[in-house]
Amino acid sequence: RTCQSQSHKFKGACFSDTNCASVCRTENFPRGQCNQHHVERKCYCERDC
């Protein structure tokens, strides 16, 4: 199962999964990707749980 948490450090709209994943790694998550959240794209960090 995968758990997602919105990144606390990522600022602004998320257009690059690579940038999102890099920020997530600084938050101790192994990966991250952009997901649509209402009208904005946000960076969500993922880990196995």
Swiss-Prot record:
UniProt-listed InterPro entries: Defensin_plant, Scorpion_toxin-like, Scorpion_toxin-like_sf
Keyword Disulfide bond set for record: yes
Protein name, as recorded: Defensin Tm-AMP-D1.2
Entry function: Plant defense peptide.
Highest taxon in the source lineage: Eukaryota
Pfam families, A to Z: Gamma-thionin
SUPFAM superfamilies attached to this UniProt entry: Scorpion toxin-like
Organism listed in the record: Triticum monococcum (Einkorn wheat)
Cystine connections: C3-C49, C14-C34, C20-C43, C24-C45
UniProt keyword list: Antimicrobial, Disulfide bond, Fungicide, Plant defense
